[in-house]
């Protein structure tokens, strides 16, 4: 069990790192990107490409769809939401995991998976949400940083 927990921690750190070849770091090309999502397929040990991701904001108890997109071949989505849209509040990122796993011929447990979090309650910040997926589990972490100044 300790080995599995160590593996998960290392995998999440690898997702959140900027070590991928040819990868442009969040601070370089995406200084205006307030929310970035990174997803890893832990079964195959590769980025989870073409995964549908939707971003919702809680408005008076209702979830309002703000934006949606699919992960790239690097398992990432940049600029899924603008600074103007990403105001203080509670957000939900919904991952269409059932569709993703079914396309790979697997029968997953979850219909979809949500990551719900409060954003910008201590001033404007940049958020990177990293997610590790299997057909029966999810693990997520967040890297929250100060916004980058334009050069």
From Swiss-Prot:
L-thyroxine binds at residues 38, 76, 139. This is Transthyretin. Pfam families: Transthyretin. Belongs to the transthyretin family. The gene is ttr. InterPro entries: Thyroxine_BS (IPR023418), Transthyretin/HIU_hydrolase (IPR000895), Transthyretin/HIU_hydrolase_d (IPR023416), Transthyretin/HIU_hydrolase_sf (IPR036817). It is found in: Secreted. Thyroid hormone-binding protein, with a much higher binding affinity for triiodothyronine (T3) than for thyroxine (T4). Probably transports triiodothyronine from the bloodstream to the brain. It comes from Xenopus tropicalis (Western clawed frog). The lineage of its organism: Eukaryota, Metazoa, Chordata, Craniata, Vertebrata. Its main location: secreted.
